[in-house]
Structures are given as C-alpha cells and as structure tokens.
C-alpha cells in the first residue's frame, strides 16, 4: 500500500512498530499510513498525523451492519432436532486482504471473521449455516474488524435465539442450553486447544448460574439474562458464560445494567491480573455496544461524528462486574475479545425476563424497548 502510494519499491519501505495502546481492530487496516506518508513526502520531513474526532469517525472502518434469520425445529420432549442460521454482513477481510480468505467446500472464498460463532458447540441435530456477503456494505462503508468482529453480532443472534427457543419449549434457559452442551460427536473437542469441548462450556454456564443466583425471585421489572460463548474461533475456543442483571423502566424504556457476572475457562492463566483486566475491558465494551454505540450512514457519511451525539458507556453506567476464572492446566487461549460477545445477548435476555419485551436489534435503544412492550401488550 505504501509502496504504491509513494511510488517506491517495497524493499525501500521500512515499518517500525511501537507499543502504543490498543487498536481494537482498527490498526489492522493500514490505510491511515498513506496520508501521513504523502504529507511527509510533500514536506520533505517527518510528519505526525493526528485526526480530529470528527475526521477519525469519518475515516473509520466500523463494524458492519448485519441481518440474521434463525429457525429451530423441536422433536419429542422439546428436544432440538434442527437449526438453521443465515447471516448477511459486510466481509472485512474481503476489503482488507482478499488473498488470505480461506475457501469453502465448493472452493469459494469466504470470510471467517464474518461467520465465526455460527458453528457453535450445541448439539442441535441437523444444522445449516449460510453466510452471505453484503456487497453494499463492502462498497460503501469499508467494514472493519471492531473488537470481537463476527462473533459480536453472530453470538448476539445465536444466544438471543437460544433464549427464545427455551421459552418456546417452556424450559429454563440454562437447562435448555445444558441439554445441548453434551459434548457429543464433533462437539467433544480435541487437543491441544479444545480439550473437553462442549463440556467445558457447560461447566462455565453451570458455575455462572450458581454464582449469579439464577432462579432467584427478582423484584418487579428486574431480570436475569444468560448467554454463553466460545469466543472467537472454534479452533481455539475460550469458554465464557455471562449473567446480566438489568432493571427496566417501563415508562421511559430505559435499561439499567446493575451487574454482570462472568465465568471464564481460558485454560492456564499465565498473568491473573492482566487476564482480569482483559475481561473487565471486554465486558464493558460489550455493554457499551449493547446499550449505546451505533450510528447511521447518511449520504455515505456517519451521522454522528463526535461524542456529543455518539453515545458511549460512561462511568455512571458501569455496573458491578464479578469475574471468575476456572482453574485449569489446559492450553492458554485468547482473552481480549471473548467476553465482549456474551454481554449483549445476556442483556437482551435479561430485558425479556424483567418485563417480557423481546428486542432483536443492537444497540438496544429505549425506543425499541417501548415498542417491544407495546407489541407484547
């Protein structure tokens, strides 16, 4: 990219990498180097490029819009016999680095960053996953790799749908999931990264339910919601379960997150304090994405370009966060992203438990809660 922009051969380009905080997916795109390099070339001296907040927002590579449709079939005794999941979204790798995309069984390239999470560890009988590229998103907004990437929206759909399935079958949502986390067949896991398979996901789910007081009687308009995940990639799972406690104001539609309880099995924890910090940050990021963050694209530009209108989680909205790591001697796996993906569905499921309003869109705005309440009525 730089060689082409500067008209130089690649062997003349030297990149020096510095440890300067988190990029959270944005630094995987190298486009921001080009204007800095061109300015330096024009001035004949080193240049440090600093964007205004508005320019940074306009120049961003946001998380892709997505749409998902899921179906589930039940057999005798409420047993799940089939599940179908179709997801359409922008494919960030198709924009950033098309040559590295793997090929599917038919030899067609696909983007795992837009499909990870759909190939879950639940035993559901017949299973089909169909992932479609949203070409309009790819052409118009340059979709990026925002922290948690595909599982950030895939697991929102999967775990919200699991909750809906549990209620349709009239089964407790935790028990419903545990029934399918049986470690059968390909869900048994394998060495070195997924030893124990779905049984480890079941273990964190069981533990978080105990820790959060699942099944306790809640005050009016307060609910507990649960979600679980294996993190980013099936080939290197990080087992996470989250219970969210929320309070819903039926008049305003406002949702207040009161507590997040999270249990994680990430194999051997090498640096406990660093591990806890990663999970805290990931969980609060997930909460911000669940309840606050989002904008519209108007005439090809983001509508909200500064923090006066682009809403974020603020300190006053930070709930109690309780984290527990499962003692393990298994292979260490990633911790930067997995907890992000369990929070939003846990929040959505808690809203339903609190007031019966089922929300299916992120972020969860007060208006959407009021609409869901009205629809329920």
Where are the regions that the model predicts?
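Glycine-rich loop/linker segments at domain edges
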Residues: 65-160, 312
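Generic long, charged, amphipathic alpha-helical segments
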Residues: 310-334
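Alpha-helical support elements that line or immediately flank enzyme active sites
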Residues: 1-43, 100-119, 145-194, 200-203, ...
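Flexible, glycine/threonine-enriched loop-and-boundary segments that flank and lead into catalytic domains
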Residues: 221-245
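Beta-strand segments within the central parallel beta-sheet cores of soluble alpha/beta enzyme folds
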Residues: 11-19, 45-54, 81-86, 124, ...
């Amino acid at each position: 990219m730089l060689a082409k922009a500067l008209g130089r051969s690649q062997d003349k380009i030297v990149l020096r990498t510095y440890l300067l905080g988190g990029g959270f997916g944005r630094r995987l795109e190298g486009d921001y180097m080009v204007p800095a390099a061109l300015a330096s070339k024009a001035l004949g001296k080193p240049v440090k490029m600093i964007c205004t907040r508005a320019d940074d927002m306009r120049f961003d590579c946001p998380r892709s819009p997505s749409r998902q449709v899921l179906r589930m079939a039940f057999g005798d005794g409420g047993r799940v016999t089939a599940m179908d999941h179709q997801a359409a979204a922008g494919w960030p790798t198709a924009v950033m680095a098309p040559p590295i995309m793997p090929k599917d069984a038919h030899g067609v390239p696909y983007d795992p960053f837009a499909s990870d999470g759909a190939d879950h560890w639940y035993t559901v009988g017949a299973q089909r996953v169909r992932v479609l590229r949203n070409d309009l998103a790819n052409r118009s907004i340059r979709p990026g790799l925002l922290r948690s990437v595909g599982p950030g929206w895939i697991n929102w759909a999967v775990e919200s749908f699991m909750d809906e399935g549990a209620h349709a079958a009239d089964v407790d949502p935790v028990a419903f999931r545990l029934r399918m986390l049986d470690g059968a067949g390909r869900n048994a896991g394998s060495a070195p990264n997924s030893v124990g398979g779905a049984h480890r996901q079941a273990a964190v789910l069981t533990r978080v339910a105990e820790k959060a007081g699942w099944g306790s009687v809640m005050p009016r308009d307060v609910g507990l919601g649960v979600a679980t995940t294996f993190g980013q990639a099936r080939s290197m799972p990080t087992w996470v379960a989250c219970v969210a406690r929320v309070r819903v104001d039926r008049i305003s539609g406002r949702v207040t997150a009161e507590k997040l309880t999270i249990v994680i099995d990430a194999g051997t924890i090498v640096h406990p304090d660093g591990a806890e910090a990663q999970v805290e940050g990931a969980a609060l990021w997930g909460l911000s994405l669940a309840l606050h963050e989002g904008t519209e694209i108007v005439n090809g530009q983001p509508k909200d370009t500064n923090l006066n209108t682009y809403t974020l989680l603020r300190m006053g909205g930070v709930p109690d966060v309780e984290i527990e790591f499962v003692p393990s001697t298994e292979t260490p796996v990633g911790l930067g992203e997995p907890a992000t993906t369990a929070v939003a569905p846990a929040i959505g499921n808690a809203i339903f438990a609190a007031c019966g309003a089922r929300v299916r869109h992120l972020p969860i705005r007060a208006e959407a809660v009021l609409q869901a309440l009205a629809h329920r009525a």
